[in-house]
C-alpha cells in the first residue's frame, strides 16, 4: 500500500511541533538561581562541574526540582564589581541569588557593597541567600587554604539546597 507523502509528513510535523512545545514549556518553567560571588563561587582550582553552583543544581534536580543554577562567580571579584555587573548577570525572572561576597574587599581595600547588592536584588523581588565566608570554616580546603576541594563545594551545595528550594517555592 502506497501512502501519500502528506500522510506521513503531517503526523511527523505534528509530533515534532509537540516535542518543541513540550521542551519550551519545560524550559520556561525552570526556576533560575544565580550564584553571584568571587572565587569560591567560581570554583577556583576545580572543574566547572565540581564548583558549588553546578553541584547545587544537580542536588536540586535529583530532588525533582526544575531549576537552573547559573555560576556568576569571578576569581578575585569585589562586591563593588559584583554590583556593577549584577543587572547583566542576574536577568529579570531570576527566582533567587546565592550571594557569596568573598574576602577580596578587605584584601584590596575596597568598600563592602553587600548591603547595596542585597537591597537592589530585594527591590527586584529576588530572594537573596547569603553565603558568608565563615560558611567555609572546617570544610575541606585545597592546599592554598582559601578555596574548597570538590568535597567541600559539595558540602556547601548540600547546605544550601533546602534554602534555595524554599526560596524558589518548590
Question: What spans do the regions from the language model cover?
Answer:
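Bacterial N-terminal signal peptides that target proteins for export
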Residues: 2-15
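Hydrophobic alpha-helical membrane-insertion segments, chiefly the h-region
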Residues: 19-24
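Residue-level signal for beta-strand positions within conserved beta-sheet cores that form or flank
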Residues: 29, 65-68
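Short glycine-rich His-centered loop
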Residues: 31-46
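Short Gly/aromatic-enriched secondary-structure transition segments
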Residues: 50-51
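Alpha-helical cap/lid subdomain in secreted, periplasmic
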Residues: 54-66, 74-170
Amino acid at each position: 500500500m502506497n501512502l501519500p507523502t502528506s500522510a506521513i509528513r503531517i503526523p511527523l510535523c505534528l509530533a515534532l511541533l509537540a516535542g518543541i512545545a513540550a521542551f519550551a514549556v519545560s524550559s520556561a518553567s525552570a526556576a533560575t538561581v544565580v550564584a553571584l560571588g568571587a572565587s569560591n563561587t567560581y570554583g577556583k582550582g576545580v572543574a566547572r562541574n565540581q564548583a558549588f553552583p553546578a553541584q547545587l543544581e544537580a542536588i536540586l534536580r535529583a530532588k525533582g526540582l526544575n531549576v537552573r543554577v547559573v555560576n556568576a562567580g569571578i576569581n578575585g571579584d569585589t562586591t563593588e564589581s559584583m554590583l556593577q555587573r549584577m543587572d547583566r548577570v542576574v536577568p529579570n525572572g531570576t527566582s533567587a541569588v546565592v550571594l557569596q561576597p568573598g574576602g577580596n574587599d578587605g584584601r584590596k581595600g575596597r568598600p563592602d557593597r553587600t548591603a547595596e547588592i542585597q537591597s537592589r536584588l530585594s527591590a527586584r523581588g529576588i530572594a537573596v541567600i547569603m553565603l558568608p565566608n565563615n560558611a567555609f570554616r572546617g570544610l575541606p580546603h585545597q592546599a592554598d587554604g582559601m578555596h574548597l576541594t570538590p568535597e567541600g563545594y559539595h558540602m556547601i551545595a548540600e547546605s544550601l539546597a533546602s534554602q534555595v528550594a524554599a526560596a524558589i517555592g518548590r
